[in-house]
Amino acid sequence: MKDSHSSRRKYEKEKLVFATNNGKRTEGTPAFLKSGNTASSSSPTLQFRPTSRYPTLSHEPVYTNVLDLSSRIDANRASIMSATMGTPPSALKFSKKKISRPVVSEDTFKDKLPRATIPVKPEPQPQYKIPAAPAPTSKRVVNRGLKLNTNLRQASPILPSPSLKLDRQDAPIQINHEQKEDFLVSIPRPTPMTNLDDGKDEIGQPDPHRKYMAPPRVNSISRVQRRMSYIPYGGFDDFLDNYYKDDDTVLEDNQLKSNSRIETLEEEDGAESDSITNTVSNASSDAEPAHRHLGPVYENSGHLPSKSHFSSTDSNTDSFGLESDERSLPSVSNDLKSSETLKNPRNDDLLTLQQPPRYPHSQMVMLPARSPVEVPAPTFDRRNVSRNSNNNSPEGYDNNRTNPTVNNLPSYPTNLARPKAIKPMPTSIHGQTSPLSPIPPVHTTHGLVSDIRPLPSVSSPIMRADSTPISHNLAVTPSFSPIPQQSNKSIGNHKNTSVANVSSKVANSKFERNISMMSNSNASSPAIFEVGAEAKEKTKDAIPCHPDDKLMIPSPKIVTHGDAMQEEQRLRQKSQITPDDEVELAKVYLNALETLENKPSLAPDQASYNTRINVYRTRAVELLKKNAYPSKTQNTVPEALFLIGQFHSQGVLGFRRDLGKAFELYSLAAKKGHPLSNYRVAVCLQTGTGVKPDTSKCVAIYKKAAEMDVVEAMFRIALIYLNGLLGQKRNISLGVQWLERACKSKGPESVRAMYELAKIYEQPDRYGVSATPERKFELYKQSAVYGYAAAQCKLGECYEHGLLGCLAEPRRSIFWYTRAAEQDYGEAELGLSGWYLTGSEGILPKNGEEALLWAHKAACKGLAKAQYAVGFMMEQGIGVAADPSSAHNWYIRAAKQGFPKAKKRLEEQALSSKQTHSKAPKKKQQEQCVVM
């Protein structure tokens, strides 16, 4: 019996599939019955492979030990399969063809097998599984993302993964069109491909590296600040870009909106020319305003606008003090000028900007981002004064108070002369100071206190760019001292607080909750950050980010004191030092100076900070002057001329601001073949900065700089040809060629060229050129990842409405709208208003207050659509109590700019008012008749 069982097991494991000479297929013959385990037949045979559904031809029999062939297929079933060309028996239910069923008796094996080793015939089972019929109720349920995929092949979630593959053309089973959707379907795939991300890794576990962003809120969103840099490289060189006029640079459909923002007038000569704001860096813009606003942190210091910001006081004048028939725009905190006033850079009126000035040699950085976890509520201190016994606090402050009211806050002076001595080193930004402890003050020579934003807590997000926030007034961006949670009640119930919600019905508890969600710096950023497992449980409103949505803004170059000394030592060891080597060493000193001013924590103490600042500045200027104004035996280095011209343009590092002197230095460097100097000479000739305007020379030098591969010059000359500016004939084909050439670098300096080229491709009727949706989306995406606000807003629109081959994905749309809103881009702010108005399930809840605040923020920038949206929300009572009179004023503003919906709404209101007045007398007469 033991031999019998062992032989039986051996028999069941071995399988041999081969065909006989007469064409009949047999299966399951034991291997030891075949003499020599070889096949004597030379005719082709049919073999069954475990990886193939159908039999294939082969000239040699194959001996296989197949794991999936544990159940045999008897000879009768094999004959049927052969006669029907592989059709399974289930498909032959209604077949009328008579099939011969040859019978193979087991007596043929009895003579050759021992009686005890005859195997027991198992029950026949099919080799494959036939899927069950789909459920009739959900037969047509197919994922939309699956339908738009070509190379992505995925089984329908209705049925388990079938073992039948329908990608072969010779499949005998006939399946109707409706059933094909429940099997493996291959559908064209759009470009770009949208990843169906579910937040899990390959093995189905939650991804610990998943990135989130905080919901974009008006009063807590961060603002993109400019990092001061003495070397104007890295990104688009927008030198004197704000002196351009709209008619000279912008396309007819107003595509380059950033060029129309004129920042201010030139500073007056005399002592005031040496007076600049006391920022962490001494650099300033070529268009630096004489008076600057306190920045978005002061304007949005946790205050929700009250109803009075939106309502009108009488029939002709609204809360902004503007008559309904005026052209000027409303504003909350700044007096905005009209676009006609902003176009003239030589206007004598004082321009108060709503956003920080743009620096032609700067890099964008982000303010520290808050943690989505609830943190202690901040006070509204604008200066962080240490709580000590001495009374050195400014007027209006009480050191013993933990929560001074807003009414007692002192105002900052915005125009004070810079002290001649080196300013003290600010408090360490990256030290170990706890955010709950007060930051020691830093007293300047004027007795004022400059604060540094404290380090975020442990659960705070990781910064997108390691940088220091820069303010544009006498003090650095202020920090807010946290207070215990129990003081929230006193804040919310204080009678003198100026914080008010848009809706008058919002309770104090809701206000306290809003305050508690703010960071201790009041600059919470929806920037990307990583959240750990513990923070994930506490973060309920965080929005998951798509892995493909990220920015590629280059990090600022950091040169430490050790790097500078190492470079100096390396230069001293050289046998011969050239003028170019000395200029490169001067640039190292400038980078070290910039790093130390933006990161004062790198200095160990105050004395080291002052010494290094002096050394870096002195050595850099000496080396540059030596090679810019050399003796007769030396050659002038163009780079030194260019950098000193840059300093004269800005008035930094001890150089007096002199635009004429700067133009002379740019011209000398341009004659020496310096590429960027040629571009700046052309800009000066076009705008008349430091020289008399000359359009003919301007175009010639633009072409010369473009031939030197200056991307900015390519972009300018392309706009000139596209619009026929500066006396040139309109040549669209040549302009498009220059734009395409400018886009080849695909770097930060090409952001405007890529955006403009994509906009031109979207207007084939006007320009006669077009491109595929994939190409247009690629240009927008490359421009957006380098931080261009207009392109970021366009991506948000694409992901909102499913444009340019994209899938409609709310989280990606909100992400890119937020990136553009951080740069005060009006269209993006209106887009966020729309998302808050409608909400997105599981991503962003509805919030009427935020919708109104974002729309109002965009309306204050003069956006007609946003003005209509504010009027609509105020008329319907969304986010604020209904106020038809104020809504009417907003409709008038939008209608004056030609917005059709606003005009239509005003006509409807006029018609309804006429009908009301016409019906009123008749009703009165009827009442009189009834009485009589």
Swiss-Prot record:
SMART domains: SEL1 (SM00671)
GO cellular component: cell division site; cell tip; cytosol; mitotic spindle pole body; nucleus
Disordered: region residues: 1-53, 264-356, 374-406, 905-932
S-adenosyl-L-methionine among keywords: no
UniProt keyword Repeat present: yes
Bias type Polar residues, positions: 35-53, 274-285, 308-319
Record-listed Phosphoserine modification sites: S393
Pfam families: Sel1
Repeat (Sel1-like) residue spans along the chain: 638-674, 675-710, 711-747, 751-788, 789-825, 826-863, 864-899
SUPFAM superfamilies noted in UniProt: HCP-like
UniProt entry keywords in alphabetical sequence: Phosphoprotein, Repeat
GO BP: any one term: fungal-type cell wall organization
Biased composition (Basic and acidic residues): 1-16, 337-349
Name the record gives this protein: Chitin synthase regulatory factor 3
